[in-house]
Amino acid sequence: MTEYADDLEVERSMKDRFMTHHAESPFVSARIDGFHGLRYFPIDERYRVEARLERVDPPRESYLRTNRDGQATMRYLGDLVFMINGVECRLRLFHAGEGVGTSAFVPFRDGTSGTESYGPGRYLTLDLTEDDRYELDFNRSFNPYCAYTDAYECPFPPAENDLPVPVPAGEQAWSDDRNPATPQTAMRTLRSGGTAAKPKVTPRKSASTRAAAPRAARRRPRVAARPSRKR
């Protein structure tokens, strides 16, 4: 194995420990039994690509639908442009808003969504750069917490972030008898439209887990960091 692959395996092992034992793990907080580790595609460096950001100036407010048919308020920063297996791809880059740090996130779907990976989509997180150059490492793509339990509210990718190619890299679908990998309610919400025109609900931004979680387990947008209470 390469040093890169070794490092990634260490990150994944740390994330499994976090998911197994930490109070802010969705499996611990939602009391989901039977966790035996997350599932991943084989590590493949072809899905570690360079991208350039085509900025939207000024950034625009955007509303992403959530698994509870709500909306998450984001700032749309621009489009990341890159190549995968000879195909030009574009993904919208989002930020949670002013005063929320320098981390941005990219929700996306691809040709594996709904089969080998979580149907409503996966996430990448990025640290913002000054030169608008980014590395997109899809081997580090991960599921939102709502992939494991409906105790969490998570934004879905907009229609513009549906990639035209399969990306068999990163985290695969989680599934057990009580938490199917592709919840039908989530898929109905996704099909109703990715990006909304007007806000109806702005989910409460919860406290970050960055201080407590290992690096491999931190990669979550802030709107999905903690479950909201059911009414």
Please place each PLM-identified region on the residue numbering:
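A compositional/structural signature for long, glycine/proline-rich flexible linkers
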Residues: M1-V100, R109-T112, Y118-T125, D150, ...
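A short, structured loop/turn motif at beta-sheet edges
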Residues: L126-Y134
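Polybasic, lysine-enriched low-complexity intrinsically disordered terminal tails
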Residues: T185-R231
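Poly-acidic low-complexity segments
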Residues: E3, D137-N139, R220
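Immediate flanking context of iron-sulfur cluster ligation sites
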Residues: R133-T149
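Mixed-charge, glycine-accented linear interaction segment located at domain edges/termini
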Residues: N143, P155-P157
